[in-house]
Design a protein with these regions (language model features):
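Boundary at the C-terminal end of the N-terminal hydrophobic targeting segment
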Residues: 23-25
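N-terminal pre-domain segments of enzymes
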Residues: 27-44
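Bacterial N-terminal signal peptides
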Residues: 10-18
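Bacterial N-terminal signal peptides that target proteins for export
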Residues: 1-9
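A short glycine-rich, aromatic-capped structural motif
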Residues: 42-114, 137-140, 214-215, 286
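Short, structured beta-strand segments at or near domain termini in extracellular proteins/domains
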Residues: 275-289
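Functional-site microenvironments in short loops/helix caps that host divalent-cation chemistry
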Residues: 60, 64-69, 107, 112-267, ...
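Residues embedded in well-ordered beta-strands
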Residues: 52, 79, 170, 219, ...
Length: 289
């Protein structure tokens, strides 16, 4: 990532560390997915969230050579082959996160410094934000939710394939420049008005049917961040570096401008960061056929 782009990105996402106790979060009991899911139909997760299938096979990962906005950490473009998996159709909402808290006693999604950057009113979640993506969650919060739901965070490669499809494109919807018909972006903080209900942008969905893969909130993925990882990434089912100090954020938040909306954008973040522009979605292995 270029130094200019890196500086802009950090200015967007950096805030005080989110600290606090975490309760044990065991996944709810649930039977195996239906046979329809094994055949490639949409899957409903244990948390009730719809998931879309992403078929096995290769896709081109990383930015094409000569991209006008490409950062160093987005090169080189390389073919990656993934096994079939499922990914949440939508970002995890406040409503679903509330059910997680009720079931586990987990901590609330709150900004560590500025109460004005919260969507929840103390321990209460206003009904008006139930369908908006949860924010003020760090990487460990996201991991705990996905584990509770019987799922996991997507790998960086899984996230990019779900956003990208198998054909060359800059944005989830294709190569048409972003507009407010495609995504929620280029906003300033206005409380709950800043975020849109998940799935609001039909024109912006990905080739596999995932919504908000650009805009609304940045999304945690499983991988540790390494700016040179693409130079040594295995060609099949890459899992990211074995260790690191920062995790990867993908997508783009409500405050970003066009250059960062691209599906190739990689951002590093302290895994303890909680802020008003970061959320997540979950993924799951495909059930055996």
């Amino acid at each position: 990532m270029s130094s200019t782009k890196h500086a802009v990105t950090l200015a967007v996402i950096v805030c005080a560390l989110g600290l606090g106790g975490r309760a044990s979060a065991e996944p709810p009991a649930s039977g195996p997915p239906s046979s329809d899911a094994a055949k490639g139909a949409d899957l409903v997760g244990k948390d009730g969230a719809p998931m879309v299938p992403v078929p096995a096979g290769p896709f081109p990962m990383g930015v094409p050579k000569g991209d006008r906005d490409g950062g160093r950490d987005e090169y080189p473009r390389h073919d990656v082959s993934l096994d079939k998996y499922y990914i949440d159709k939508f970002e995890v909402t406040n409503g679903r996160y509330l059910e997680f808290i009720k079931a586990t006693g987990y901590r609330l999604p709150q900004h560590p410094q500025d109460p004005k950057r919260n969507l929840w009113q103390g321990s209460l979640m206003p009904e008006s934000v139930s369908d908006r993506p949860v924010i003020n969650v760090d990487w460990y919060d996201a991991e705990a939710y996905c584990k509770w739901a019987g799922k996991r965070l997507p790998t960086e490669a899984e996230w990019e394939k779900a956003a990208h499809g198998t054909e060359s494109r800059r944005f989830p919807w294709g190569n048409v420049e972003p507009t407010h018909k495609h995504l929620n972006f280029n906003q300033r903080w206005q409380g709950e008005k800043t975020l849109m209900p998940v799935g609001s942008y039909e024109a912006g969905k990905s080739p596999f049917g995932a919504y908000d893969m650009a805009g609304n909130v940045w999304e945690w993925v499983a991988d540790w961040y390494d700016p040179a990882y693409y130079e040594k990434s295995p060609p099949r089912n890459p899992q990211g570096p074995e260790s690191g100090t920062h995790k990867v954020l993908r997508s783009s938040g409500w405050q970003v401008e066009t250059p960062l909306v691209r599906i190739f954008t990689r951002v590093k973040s302290d895994p303890l960061i909680r802020n008003e522009s970061t959320g997540f979605r979950c993924a799951a292995d495909a059930p055996a056929e």
